[in-house]
Amino acid sequence: ISEVAKHNFVNKVFLKYFLYFNKIKTFKSGEYDIYGKPMSEIIFDMNEGNTITHKILINEGTNIYDLNNLINDSMLVNDCQFLSCIKTDFNFKEGILYPDTYFYKKGNLASNILQKSHDRLKKYLDELKYSQNNNNNLDINEILILSSIVEKEAGNNNEKKLIAGVFLNRLEKNMRLQADPTIIYGLLPNFDGDIKKSNILDRNNKYNTYMINGLPPSPIAISSISSIDAVFNGKPGKF
């Protein structure tokens, strides 16, 4: 009541009478926008629980480190550091979210948003798997890994089919992918912005596709739906 009166230049006694005559006995707790609003609208919002809605944008191309910072900078309670809380069938925690804008209230648990996002991706992948034939021999885990590399390599959506074809061709011929974004991911969170020759020759980096054969052990970022489709429907190209 004091806060409402203070920001709306209303006498506190008058405000109490207003509440009494309108039979308003309690307010619902939460975060409210009271600035510049008439008192009647504020009282209505607080009585109905019309709290402020925030949004968080989970972008394609986001990795698990950036995501953790994004959550820490939001109004969410980060009870799910590095997706540790997610219930999933995948044997990795990177790149398992559906990119989109999600809405929440201040103090909501991040785990609820993240699990919802993961479940959306899982549903999409299940529908994709059963709706059409895969053009290559990759399983869903491998598709998600490769699509994340395509996501980080592509400058725009038009390039994704071509890039997917190049990587599928290399996999089919047992060639190394040689994708710079995988090296960078293996150096996180301490990558300084410059890939050095020693990084390219580093056999201890399990994400270094210049040194390892086949795919890295997990995705390197969240994939867009267009990247997933490019890999799922992709065929080895003659490149």
Annotate each PLM feature.
Residues I1-L128:
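Signal peptide-directed extracytoplasmic domains
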Residues D73-V77, T88-F239:
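Bacterial extracytoplasmic/cell-wall-associated proteins, especially those involved in peptidoglycan
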